[in-house]
């Protein structure tokens, strides 16, 4: 009996891990927004670690957003003087 229970448990874990890798765990919120601790909608996507809601997007797009936000912050500091 214990062996069957262990087998069922292992099978359940394998199925859950497989579905997570395939991107079946949905994003939270709408329009691709996701929590930084959630899997993205697509297995090729990542969650950008930026101010505000984490956005599910491609890794390259995260880098572009970081550069744009960095420039915006520089302009704000310059014009505040």
Swiss-Prot record:
The keyword Magnesium does not apply. Residues 73-81 form a propeptide. Keywords: Amidation, Cleavage on pair of basic residues, Disulfide bond, Secreted, Signal, Toxin. One of its GO terms (molecular function) is toxin activity. Residues 1-23 form the signal peptide. Disulfide bonds join 27-41, 34-48, 40-56, 47-62. The cysteine framework is XI (C-C-CC-CC-C-C). This is Conotoxin Eb11.3. It comes from Conus eburneus.
